[in-house]
Amino acid sequence: MNTATQAPKDSADSATERFRYGFLKGNPQLTKNGELKHLLSIEGLPKAIVNHILDTADQFVSVTDREVKKVPLLRGKSVFNLFFENSTRTRTTFEIAATRLSADVLNLNINASSTSKGESLLDTINNLSAMHADMFVVRHASSGAPYLIAQHCAPHVHVINAGDGRHAHPTQGLLDMYTIRHYKKDFTKLRVAIVGDILHSRVARSDIHALTTLGVPEVRAIGPRTLLPGGLEQMGVRVFHNLDEGLKDVDVIIMLRLQNERMSGALLPSAQEYFKSWGLTPERLALAAPDAIVMHPGPMNRGVEIDSQVADGPQSVILNQVTFGIAVRMAVMGIVAGNHD
């Protein structure tokens, strides 16, 4: 990324450091009055704001069932989707969410944009701001890119982090919380297991911060030693290096894919060997609570981290996560658009 002020490079060590101590000091996503102006990370968000987002999403779920699937909340506003990394579910659901809020949505073709010709990220943002953008939805391979944009964009512009490097994916974390609340109601009595490549997963980071904020008494991280970051125990997370032990009696299972594109070297054996030790099969699912739900942020790698019988089975709520994601992203966009310094 070519910027006058560079976002930090990712590494296993820097990912662990951010996991333990946060990305930036302070909370630049809140207004002086403590309202949500940007959504950059779940870390540091007050519980009241998290619950407000989930409660607002409740109001938007029914929009999907209407004959006219629109509300006028963002009418006249321009939302720019800036996806510097490939995405299917996240970009599409953000586009649907903004459209259902009656916003004008523009998807920047990164490969054909001036950033591919050497223009800095901040120059690109300044030019788009001059076109009277009201909101930037940003996905970037560099951790911190959305923070950088939020610090330098025009005062009226709102920034939503759609995933930055290994750091955070706050709307995925929020839609995961919405899904859990929909099926389990009470966070304060749950055991939640996050399984797989947690070291490289921005979703895991956002989920852990959200779960602890909402009062989940037991969060488990399950995976090979090479794929677990340091600092988990200091966050109150129980660490397991054996899948069978970690799944015992859990109420929610969040499976993660291997983030091969973020790995700097060969950390694991073959996909078949990984599935043998860490894949969620019907037999392993039976170790969890009888009414446990299975979640996955996608994309899934069947036969690697999850068996098709589980992914398509009655305890899977994976497709519901996608559906709920639209309402949650509508809620986030609607809330931030109404808050200014």
Swiss-Prot record:
L-aspartate binds at K117, R202, R257. SUPFAM superfamilies: Aspartate/ornithine carbamoyltransferase. InterPro entries: Asp/Orn_carbamoyltranf_P-bd (IPR006132), Asp/Orn_carbamoylTrfase (IPR006130), Asp/Orn_carbamoylTrfase_sf (IPR036901), Asp_carbamoyltransf (IPR002082), Asp_carbamoyltransf_Asp/Orn-bd (IPR006131). It catalyses: carbamoyl phosphate + L-aspartate = N-carbamoyl-L-aspartate + phosphate + H(+). Transmembrane segments: none annotated. It is an enzyme of class 2 (transferase). GO terms for molecular function: amino acid binding; aspartate carbamoyltransferase activity. Pathway: Pyrimidine metabolism; UMP biosynthesis via de novo pathway; (S)-dihydroorotate from bicarbonate: step 2/3. HAMAP family: Asp_carb_tr. Heterododecamer (2C3:3R2) of six catalytic PyrB chains organized as two trimers (C3), and six regulatory PyrI chains organized as three dimers (R2). PANTHER family: ASPARTATE CARBAMOYLTRANSFERASE, ORNITHINE CARBAMOYLTRANSFERASE, MITOCHONDRIAL. Catalyzes the condensation of carbamoyl phosphate and aspartate to form carbamoyl aspartate and inorganic phosphate, the committed step in the de novo pyrimidine nucleotide biosynthesis pathway. This is Aspartate carbamoyltransferase catalytic subunit. The gene is pyrB.
